C-alpha cells in the first residue's frame, strides 16, 4: 500500500487535477494534514538521527519544564511521581509511543499539538493550528537539541553550502 502510486502522490494541487477532480474523489492528490503530537516529535528526532527505535521496554521521560510536576503534587509525597527526572542518553530519544504520562500533567508539548486527554476516551483527535504550536517548535528543548545535532551533522559531512541546503530541504 505504501509503495502504491496513489499513496505517494503530492498534496500540491495542479490546475489540471483541480479541474478533473475538484473534490479529490479519484484521489488525484494526497491529502493535506498536520501530523499528530507523537508523530511530530518522532519526525523531529528521526530527521536529526536521534530517534531510538528500540521496541518495548520502559517508558521514556522526555524534557519538561522544571518544577512543573512539583506544582501538581499539592505538597505530598507521591513516590516516583513526586519529582520528574527526564531520561538521559538513548532512553531520552525513544519513540513518543513510549512517553510516560501523568494524568494530571501530560507532556505540555504533546498537549499543544492536540494529544488526547487520558481522562476520557477520544474517538477522533482534534486537529488545530495555533500560534502556540509555532512557538513550541521554536523553543522546545528537544526540538532545539535535534536542530543542533542536525546542523552539526550537516556541517561535519558536507562542505559546500548549496549542497548542504539541498540535503536539508
Language-model features and meaning:
Residues 8, 13-168:
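An acidic, gly/pro-interrupted, aromatic-rich
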Amino acid at each position: 500500500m505504501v509503495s502504491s502510486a496513489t499513496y505517494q502522490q503530492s498534496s500540491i494541487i495542479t490546475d489540471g487535477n483541480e479541474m478533473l477532480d475538484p473534490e479529490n474523489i479519484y484521489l488525484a492528490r494526497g491529502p493535506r494534514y498536520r501530523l499528530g503530537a507523537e508523530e511530530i516529535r518522532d519526525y523531529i528526532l528521526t530527521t536529526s538521527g536521534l530517534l531510538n527505535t528500540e521496541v518495548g521496554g520502559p517508558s521514556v521521560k522526555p524534557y519538561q519544564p522544571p518544577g512543573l510536576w512539583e506544582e501538581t503534587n499539592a505538597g505530598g509525597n507521591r513516590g516516583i511521581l513526586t519529582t520528574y527526572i527526564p531520561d538521559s542518553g538513548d532512553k531520552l530519544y525513544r519513540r513518543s509511543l513510549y512517553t510516560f504520562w501523568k494524568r494530571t500533567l501530560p507532556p505540555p508539548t504533546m498537549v499543544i499539538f492536540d494529544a488526547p486527554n487520558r481522562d476520557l476516551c477520544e474517538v477522533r483527535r482534534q486537529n488545530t493550528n495555533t500560534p502556540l504550536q509555532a512557538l513550541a517548535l521554536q523553543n522546545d528543548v528537544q526540538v532545539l537539541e535535534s536542530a543542533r545535532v542536525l546542523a552539526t551533522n550537516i556541517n561535519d559531512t558536507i562542505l559546500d553550502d548549496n549542497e548542504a541546503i539541498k540535503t536539508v530541504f
